[in-house]
Amino acid sequence: MSKERLAYIDYWTHQHTKSGNFLREILSEEFEIVDFWWKPNEKIPMEEIDKFEHMFFFHTIFPYQVMKKFQNKKILWAPMYDALNFRNSFFQSIFWKQISALGIKVIKFSDKITKSIKNEDIETLKLNYFIKPNFLALANEENKMNIFFWDRGRIQIKDWLHLFNKKDINEIVYFPNPDPGVTMMENNDPQQQKDYNIKYINKKFLPKNEYLDIFEKCNIFIAPRKKEGIGLTIVEAISRGMFIVGYDDATMNEYISDKRVGFIYDENTIEKINFSNVIQNYEYRKKNAELNYNKWVLEKKKIIPLLKKKNKLIKKPIFLLLFI
């Protein structure tokens, strides 16, 4: 028996990052997936997409006037918190009223999206993504701090280095590789490199096997952005039992549940990271990762039934829907 076809509409950069592939794997159990890679200012292939009864939008979604043409479809959207930028609370409210009017169903990978939607009548599914744990990290068997920092141009070494006592650090593995379109500030302080034993990775691209090899040698992961839609590198680090240091915003402050798992900071943080929290709680982090992964395995089963439900169209006063 052949599978139903599903239009999977994704942001074009994810062709390379493959950040939406974990959802493709889930959806492919039920559907034959046809990818549409959307890029801003390029023509939307309306006629092709309109042939599908089921549509899944990851990260991106088309403007309201376009989405209105798909009202009789079964649509599920997984927005990313770090990509939702509203001019003010008024436009935020109007946006979610439009999503509600279209009956689009929403997966929420962040509590911040729940707060953004507020009380709008939108059918949602709250999920926390975790991957299968793999506890082989050699560094976690040692009584020293080995730090990995992938500098993506969003956070600098100076933003978090003061959180550590210098005597506790064995080495810092530093990979300067910015996000597309982001200009990095050079970190070329020779004395700092010597004092903190900073080891540079001078590559433009790090294959996944090399990336995971570094994880094996480090027990602390510095979250590279101030906010995330999901934070796939964070999820990978959690699966290795690493101690996560993250800025106080989504999704870091959701994944870091207590000080045995990681450390949350902002510009006003003066507290230092406790050496014993890193070294003595590896077993706790392992159990925490296993527990949360098992929850994910159960919860992800709700995705396909939600997608297959017919969109619930809600009539709204027309003046609310004239924006965008």
Question: Each predicted region: which residue ranges?
Answer:
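A charged, aromatic-enriched C-terminal amphipathic alpha-helix characteristic of glycosyltransferases
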Residues: 267-319
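Conserved catalytic-core segment of nucleotide-activated headgroup transferases in glycan assembly
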Residues: 133-134, 141-194, 198
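Short alpha-helical segment that forms part of, or immediately flanks, the ligand-binding pocket
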Residues: 212, 235-239, 253-254
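Aromatic "clamp/platform" in nucleotide-sugar-dependent glycosyltransferases that forms part
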Residues: 226
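Membrane-proximal helix-turn-helix segments that form the acceptor-binding/catalytic region
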Residues: 82-83, 88-106
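Short hydrophobic beta-strand element within catalytic cores of glycosyltransferases
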Residues: 243-246
